[in-house]
Each structure stands twice: as C-alpha cells, then as structure tokens.
Curated annotation (Swiss-Prot):
It is found in: Cytoplasm. Its EC number is 4.2.1.19. It comes from the Bacteria. The keyword Thylakoid does not apply. This is Imidazoleglycerol-phosphate dehydratase. Its main location: cytoplasm. GO terms for biological process: L-histidine biosynthetic process. The keyword Cytoplasm applies. It comes from Agrobacterium fabrum (strain C58 / ATCC 33970) (Agrobacterium tumefaciens (strain C58)). Keywords: Amino-acid biosynthesis, Cytoplasm, Histidine biosynthesis, Lyase. GO terms for molecular function: imidazoleglycerol-phosphate dehydratase activity.
Length: 198
C-alpha cells in the first residue's frame, strides 16, 4: 500500500503554518503553536487517531489566538485530504460516544468529499484559562472544510469546560482513526456507488 502522508506549508500575513501527517502512524506528535491549551488538544487528536502529526505554527498571538487556531485547522485538514488521496479502500464512516469523567460527547464522520460541520456543543464559560472556548468550533469548522469531511459533534452533558473541549478532540480523533482505516473487503475500491467521493 502506498504511504498515506501529507504535508502542507501555509503562509499568510497572519500566520506561518507547517503540517505533516502520516495517516498510518502510531500517534506520535511534535506540536508547537504558541498556544499551550491548543497544543494539548492537538496532542490528543494525534494520540487517539494514531495519525502522526508534526505541526509548527508562528502566528499573530499579540492580537489573539484566532488566526493561529483557524489556520492550523485549515492546514491539518488539507494535509489529511492530501494523505488520503482518492480515498480508495477506506472505511469512510464512523461514530462514537466518548466519556471522560462527568462528560460525554459524540462524534460522527463521513469522509465524503463534502465538507460540513454540525456543532452542538455549549461551554459555560468564554475561556479555559486564557483560551477562548469559541475557538474549539472554529478549529473543527476549518478542519472539516479543508479535509472534505462531514463532521458532527454533539456534547451530551458535562460540567467541566476543559473536559468538554477534550472530549471533542478525543472523539473526533477516534472516529478519524476508524474511518480512515483500510477495509480489506473494499479491495481498493472507492467506498461510494458513484465511484468517487465528492
């Protein structure tokens, strides 16, 4: 099987982002965005998806974290799309309820080629430490749009905002792990009656 790796370098007046992913990795990561909480979340995304990720970001953090988070999501999504290629042989669909202490979050994905995010997650505070909670949605919107996936994220319940955010990243990681796996019964076919995913 061909290597499923993708690399994206994205430079704008706001950020400089370098992302390398290996879909068939072991969950190793090297992450530096300048935003501590975000680094922690991306480490969870890599570890639990088993997608190796090497992410280096320099952003306009003197303004806020928004551009850094959004542009990182864009680049990760593009790198995943590049690594998956025409998506032959993949499982395509996955869904999961993930528990962490008092919190339960559901994620479902269709690696469809049709980007869409359904987001039903509410935080009880605007920040986790210094990190804006609204940026969690911004990240997943950018990821879904640029990876070409349909992604649903639903928080059933939870009291701790850190746990709510973390279960979003871990649940998405786990469904990406399953949906990107090669299904040997597909025998290299594109998993769609249309013959393509778009």
């Amino acid at each position: 099987m061909a290597e499923r790796k993708g690399e994206i370098i994205r430079k704008t007046n706001e950020t400089s982002v370098s992302v390398r992913v290996d879909i068939d990795g072991t969950g190793k990561s090297k992450i530096s965005t300048g935003v501590g909480f975000f680094d922690h979340m991306l480490d969870q995304l890599s570890r639990h998806s088993l997608i190796d990720m090497d992410i280096e970001v320099q952003g306009d953090l003197h303004i806020d974290d928004h551009h850094t988070v959004e542009d990182t999501g864009i680049a990760i999504g593009q790198a995943i799309a590049k690594a998956l290629g025409d998506r032959r042989g993949i499982t395509r669909y996955a869904s999961l309820d993930l528990a962490m202490d008092e919190t339960m979050t559901k994620a479902a994905v269709d690696i469809s080629g049709r980007p869409f995010l359904v987001w039903n997650v509410n935080f009880s505070a605007p920040k986790i430490g210094t990190f804006d909670t609204e940026l969690v949605r911004e990240f997943f919107q950018a990821l879904a749009q640029n990876a070409g996936i349909t992604l649903h994220i639903l928080n059933h319940y939870g009291a701790n905002n850190h746990h709510i955010a973390e279960t979003c990243f871990k649940a998405v990681a786990r469904v990406l792990r399953t949906a990107t796996e090669i299904d040997p019964r597909q025998a290299g076919r594109v998993p769609s009656t249309k013959g393509m995913l778009a």
